[in-house]
């Protein structure tokens, strides 16, 4: 665990290097407010690790989940600590709970589920923690009793939530779950608006004027007008031809009629002359 603590300090220093000037260990110890050592295998806290932990001046959250720790001895007293997480370890005695009361008197959240506590009455010790409002104890042997929450609420009056349920039996999300849910809601809303705006953009794109399309439409319109003009001209030509033919035919008929009339007049004159001649004789 000593290496994990030093690595965390070095990481903080690199993240807070300003203008090429490295942050100091003192800055890191004063500024770090949480130390998460989940999964780092250990059974107890060594003296070297204890001395390192003493350097943290403003630690508010300490997580030792799934480390296999069996005792809390050598973890220094941390008055600023608000959250202590010790789930899935090998803790089992009332002495562990007493140590928590003595050394972390201001904690508001204690997660100690998945350990080996068998006697629910041992937890009455925690009533000395006046700020404790959230307690996690599920997957301990005593929690097999379906009424364990009710019993804990009775001798821990300040506690508001046990294993995500309040005194009325209503489920209450943890702060981490609330943040995750808010993040999902924000993303859902964001995705909704992005999709909505995208649809609107797609609709707008459908109605964006296209100069080429306008030109094509104008060309097509011009072609149609030209075709109509040609059809009109062709029709006029045909009408003129029909008129000329009719005119010629009419003129031909009139000419024939005049020729026939002249012939008839000549014949009539001949007949008149013959008649006059006969009378003279």
Swiss-Prot record:
LRR repeats lie at residues 29-52, 56-78, 79-103, 105-128. Residues 245-266 have a biased composition (Basic and acidic residues). Residues 140-178 form the LRRCT domain. Pfam families: LRR_9 (PF14580). InterPro entries: AN32 (IPR045081), LRR_dom_sf (IPR032675). Residues 197-281 are annotated as: Disordered. Residues 197-244 have a biased composition (Acidic residues). Gene3D superfamilies: Ribonuclease Inhibitor. One of its GO terms (molecular function) is histone binding. GO terms for cellular component: nucleus. Keywords: Leucine-rich repeat, Repeat. PANTHER family: ACIDIC LEUCINE-RICH NUCLEAR PHOSPHOPROTEIN 32, ACIDIC LEUCINE-RICH NUCLEAR PHOSPHOPROTEIN 32 FAMILY MEMBER A. Belongs to the ANP32 family. This is Acidic leucine-rich nuclear phosphoprotein 32-related protein. It comes from Plasmodium falciparum (isolate 3D7).
